[in-house]
Regions:
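Negatively charged, low-complexity tracts enriched in Asp/Glu with abundant Ser/Thr
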Residues: 1-32, 57
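A short, exposed loop/beta-hairpin motif centered on an aromatic-Gly-Thr core
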Residues: 55-70
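Short arginine-rich
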Residues: 77-85
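A short, structured beta-strand/loop element
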Residues: 33-59
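Short, charge-rich amphipathic interface segments used for partner binding and complex assembly
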Residues: 53-54, 72, 76
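Compositionally biased, intrinsically disordered/low-complexity regions enriched for serine, proline
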Residues: 3, 36-38, 63
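Small side chains
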Residues: 25, 48, 61-63, 74-75
């Protein structure tokens, strides 16, 4: 199953664009790139690195996920929580 833009992001006029490699994604608000999510190997599974593009600040959570897709979905949820939504 492909990773799609979650409802909470759509409600705020945001968009997820999964990169052509299918392994990472970018979050846009009002057409402007705001965050990059990149699943990374962690403890034999995957974690998600979340970077704010305007200043490079990292917003990573501590979730570990079984697959790359799950890490991308989990990273979106971690981002939602960090943003207080």
């Amino acid at each position: 199953m492909a990773v799609t833009t979650p409802d909470w992001l759509k409600q705020r006029e945001g968009e997820l664009q999964v990169h052509k490699d299918g392994r990472s994604g970018s979050v846009y608000f009002a057409g402007q790139l705001q965050y990059v999510l990149m699943p990374m190997p962690a403890k034999g599974k995957f974690a998600c690195r979340i970077s704010e593009t305007i200043n490079g600040r990292r917003l990573d959570g501590d979730g570990i996920y079984p697959t790359n897709e799950d890490a991308l979905r989990g990273g979106l949820e971690e981002l939602r929580a960090k943003l207080g939504w």
